[in-house]
Amino acid sequence: MNPPDERFDIVDRDDRVVGSGLRSEIHARGLLHRAVHLWLFHEDGRILLQKRSLSKDREPGRWTSSVSGHVNSGEEYDTAMKREIPEEIGIPTATCQGLGRIKYFPACDATDQEFVWLYRATHSGPFQPDPSEVAGLEWFTPTQIDQMLVHQPGDFSSCLKMLWKQRPR
């Protein structure tokens, strides 16, 4: 779940740490901070998307990346990614084949003022999602995601829409 007393680093426009603050304060004041997203690919090319828990404080019930989360205060992006994978979808990080960074996104309104590193890996499951974090997991082809974004854009988180539009091809 997302306790309001989680502590995150506050960063400047160049993604340099300038302080730290509580999650609730950072979000309320729109301060710049950091996050990670992972797109998990099945061996057949489908992408696993996560439906955010209805108890989330930001964009509940919307489809987003396979895994996503904040970088805690004093933590590096890669460490946060490795922590979030077992927390959210219940698999050991070591079982994700080819885990690596694919693109960096600057903070903006669509990312909720988060600098984001997008990662990718391959894993075909099974998964054990944490119900306090994840309402569901589903595999989609890239074509299905493209079509859903046209016909059902409100079903997706703002961040996923932006990441998908600007994804490496």
Regions found by a protein language model. Give the residues of each.
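Short helix-to-loop capping/linker segments positioned immediately adjacent to catalytic or ligand/cofactor-binding
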Residues: 15, 88, 104-109
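Nudix hydrolase/Nudix homology domain
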Residues: 22-24, 61, 73, 100-103, ...
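The catalytic Nudix box helix
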Residues: 48-49, 66-99
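Short, well-ordered strand-loop elements centered on a beta-strand within folded domains, enriched
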Residues: 17-21, 45-51, 126-130
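A glycine-rich, hydrophobic loop/mini-helix early in the fold
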Residues: 35-67
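A short, polar/proline- and glycine-enriched secondary-structure boundary/capping micro-motif
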Residues: 29-31, 58-63, 140-141
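Acidic, metal-coordinating catalytic segment for phosphate/diphosphate chemistry
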Residues: 2-37, 43
